[in-house]
Amino acid sequence: MGSHEQTADVTGQRFAALALAALGVVYGDIGTSPLYAVKEVFAGNHPIPVTMLNIYGSLSLIFWALVIVVSVKYVTFIMRADNRGEGGIMALIALALHTVHDKPQHAKWIMIVGVLGAAMFYGDGMVTPAMSVLSAVEGLEVATPALKPFVIPLTMVVLFILFFVQRSGTATVGAFFGPVMLVWFSALALLGVHNIVDHPAILMALNPAYGIEFLLENKAHSLVAMGNVVLAVTGAEALYADMGHFGRKPISRAWFAFVLPALVLNYFGQGALILGDPEAAKNPFFLSAPDWALYPLVGLATLATVIASQAVISGAFSVTRQAMQLGFVPRMEVQYTSDREQGQIYLPAVNWGLMVAVMILVLGFRSSNNLAAAYGIAVTGDMVITSILATVVVAKVWKWGWFKAGLLFACFLSVELVFLAANILKIPDGGWFPLVAGMGVFVLMTTWKRGRQLLSDRLRGERLELSMFLDSLASSMPTRVAGTAVFLNADPKGVPHALLHNLMHNKVLHERVVLLSVQFFDVPYVPDIDLVEVRQLKENFWSVVIQYGFKDIPNVPEALALCADAGLAFSSLETSYFIGRETLIPRLGSEMAFWREKIFVAMFRNAGSATAFFKIPSNRVVELGTQVVL
């Protein structure tokens, strides 16, 4: 009995720790939305009049958006669509693709829609840090208007420090994220209660009738307001994306028990404040605090927005690595910043690229009011794409059938498409930025995928069949030298070009030759028992296939060590790795547009080396080049 209670207690402690950690990572973005959501409705670039109906109506819409989009869609349904415990757009693409493996045309469209969703994520990832940190630092203007000239420089400094420390990893400071966000959400709730007490009638806005009346009364202008209401649910996709780190239950319990109540109390508190003092609409979040709490609140808000930005940056690293292993982006340098957590990674190219984009946004838009126009369209586009992919998964994987699945997600899409339409109106004011950025990423990802496919087809067309090559060795065996040669081989049925070049120029073969193929599958992880497949061929040739999931960390020497059980042992001092390196030449009239060929060639030229990506010892590598005309 005592042992059972102790186990339950440990389990409870573990669950509480996961829920606290989820507060710091999952809820940073949506948790900082109170800084600007209500303000943008009444004091943004397209404000609505401060009337009782508009206050009640906008709060009602915010509340029901949180319920329908976050509580029902994401927590109740989407988070159940996991790929072996993992969530996020890449996991959803993989699940949807499983349903159409025998229909290439359907798979193509699922791939296009999914990649578009991933590209929109990058557009959102550029705007979120700029919008969040700038909104927090703007609190200084409320405290002391004389500090207004320092808002932009201070925002730039905070953002630079944020991106600069990424290479050190978040393992140390990450331990503080949860407690800081616990204080933040507690502060949100207390500020809300403080103002609701003065005008408790504001709670009547929980009635959806006020939201409907607001839409009917404001007619076309209500669509503009909906573009600002959606700011309250930005960050909802993080619940699904980070599910693999914390699990569905800790994330959902934290939402219903703590995050949702704190957000609702704060939004309604801001509404109560504006109800009593319409002038407070210019910045209701900071004006809802007592004077003595203003500077501490600015400091806490800045910390919270840095944490929210950190989650987006880490998400960009994670999505990029997954996209890399699924073949949508070229290999690039990946640094692992924690010995214990393989999810904690750092990609220098992504980090500095994001930083430049964020700095340009801050300098270009110069205020959170202006940035709000750029915020939302990428998020709502991502939500719509998630609903489309989830419909496929629910219909085919969960076996609900198209009618029931379509009916369910039609309800969500009816809300999300209104949000998307509202944000399309923002395109001239700044919504073009995440769209252009997202479409740019989409073009790069699809160009890389298509280019790799064309290159593979070209090399396959020139290949020598492995069986024919091995048969020819029996009649004309070249000189064999001591040691083991490992040739990376994209096509297990063909002879690697590097092997043919080595044989042509050096006239020798190693005593033992290993043809190594590395394959990536649309599952998060591959267990060790399935990691390697070993086959012995003729003439002391061996075929080894290493299989990774899209979240695995490729390490060829470690994987090859598992081959010993199949009779293929490796000595690091006697093993050489031969890698082919192609020089690409674009040409007019190929299957891909010439301008895309040029982009692909540039990406290919700047891609990271296979040596670093697969953790192969550089002092044991021989690279052999060849020219390929696309």
From Swiss-Prot:
Q: Name one GO molecular function term.
A: potassium ion transmembrane transporter activity
Its transmembrane ranges are 15-35, 59-79, 109-129, 145-165, 173-193, 223-243, 255-275, 297-317, 345-365, 374-394, 405-425, 427-447
Q: Which reaction does it catalyse?
A: K(+)(in) + H(+)(in) = K(+)(out) + H(+)(out)
Keywords tagged on the record: Cell inner membrane, Cell membrane, Ion transport, Membrane, Potassium, Potassium transport, Symport, Transmembrane, Transmembrane helix, Transport
Membrane topology type: Multi-pass membrane protein
Q: Which is one Gene Ontology cellular component term of this protein?
A: plasma membrane
Q: Does the keyword Transport apply?
A: yes
- Principal subcellular localisation of the protein: membrane
The entry's localization annotation reads: Cell inner membrane
Q: List the disulfide bonds.
A: none
The entry's function note states: Transport of potassium into the cell. Likely operates as a K(+):H(+) symporter.
For this entry, the protein name equals: Probable potassium transport system protein Kup 1
Say which species the protein is native to.
Answer: Dechloromonas aromatica (strain RCB)
